[in-house]
């Protein structure tokens, strides 16, 4: 039987939601092993002068706990 733990993270990008999601996994993987999935809870974009300047995701990352 495996155990899975979930952490909540926020990540951003100036290029898009896909890159923000990839940044979330990349940063989490620096300290967490065995990442299995990412669930995007919220997405938002910051706007300045009628243009999107950054994208952000609030996500849950699931990873398997080693025994």
Report residues per predicted region:
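A cross-kingdom feature marking charged/low-complexity
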Residues: 44-67
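Short, well-ordered alpha-helical segments
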Residues: 2-36
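Structural motif
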Residues: 4, 38, 54-58
């Amino acid at each position: 039987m495996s155990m899975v733990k979930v952490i909540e993270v926020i990540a951003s990008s100036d290029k898009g939601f896909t890159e923000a999601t990839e940044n979330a996994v990349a940063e989490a993987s620096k300290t967490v092993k065995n990442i299995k999935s990412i669930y995007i809870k919220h997405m938002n974009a910051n706007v300045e002068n009628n243009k999107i300047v950054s994208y952000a995701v609030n996500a849950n990352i699931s990873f398997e706990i080693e025994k």
